[in-house]
Structures are given as structure tokens and as C-alpha cells.
């Protein structure tokens, strides 16, 4: 069953975010992930103001997602992330395919 990373973020360092994106994208692909949403326009139908940016990444499973997040490949991106952006990161499991 697919699993998703939902990231609400605000960029603090425009140069650092490009470095982070490059490293993160390579590590995501290596673990079978793919971007579904990457900073497109967002609107709010209910609730508070929208986050500055939203990113959604799909992985084949929650196990694979957790392997990616704990991986040495992504650890390098996390080092850059700490100074490049603030974020809230959510992991969520998808629903089984409809039959």
C-alpha cells in the first residue's frame, strides 16, 4: 500500500533550498518515491492560512518511506534542510486499491 510524505514548508535560504532539493530528489528516487506535488499554487477552503509551500511525495509503502527517511542518502539533505527551510513533515499511509 502506498505511503505519502506531506511537507508544509517555508524557505529561509533560497540558495540552500536548491541544494536540499537536489539531494532530496536523488534520494527519493533511489527509494522508489515520486513527487506528486512540489510547490504549486495552494488555496484554503477551510481553516487557517495556507502554508507557503506544499510538497507531497508518494512511496510504494510505509516501510520504504521510513527506509528513505532514515537513509544515509537523505541524511545529507537533512543537514542542509536545517538551515534552508522550516517545515512540518507528515507521514501517512494510503488506502488499499479499490476493487
Residue ranges and their predicted role:
Residues 1-54, 59-70, 93-99:
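Short S/T/G/P-rich N-terminal loop/turn motif that feeds into the first structured element of a domain
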Residues 62-90:
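C-terminal structural segments of small proteins and small subunits
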